[in-house]
Amino acid sequence: MEIIDMIKSPEELLQFMNDNITYGFVGKNGKKYTNMNSPDWNDWYQVCYVQNGDEVLKSKVGTCWDQVELERAWFIKNNYEFKTIFIWFEVSGENDLPSHTFLIYKKNGKYYWFEHAFESFKGIHEFNSESEAIQFVKDKQFEFALKNSKSAKLEDLAYLKAYEYPKPKDYLDVDEYLMHVTAGKYNKDKHL
């Protein structure tokens, strides 16, 4: 029996991830990158590929993009209603503005943001609606960008977009992944 099959609740999944999964990425060469302050981290765009859930379990390392695929696998196996969301700043030209992926699931009429990769918000957060959850994450992402991005400006908030996206193909590089997630359903809700 796979370890993932022994996990019986979202809370247990979060605890498992807390105990076993580290933020970072795996390069196409199989090398694990976990030190964001290392000069090697600067190469992520060229060397990173998006892992599927099984690969994250094996490597024990993943970006939010990867970790959501592990979460997706568990939520599918356990018959939850959920969506995966990608948010990013749609600005032209090179920039250091962050993107984020996350999972929202529905249970007993409530919506829950399941978060492991966004360190300061690690946990399961309850909301009354899907749009409320997405807006909350967007607000936190914007605050994070203002604190951590050299290029972030207040007017960038207007360019922070959310996309619901389906499971990506295996072994996508960064550009392929970005094309996949931004081809998803653009969330045009007036509250977003």
Give residue ranges: language-model regions.
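A structural boundary/capping signal
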Residues: 1-192
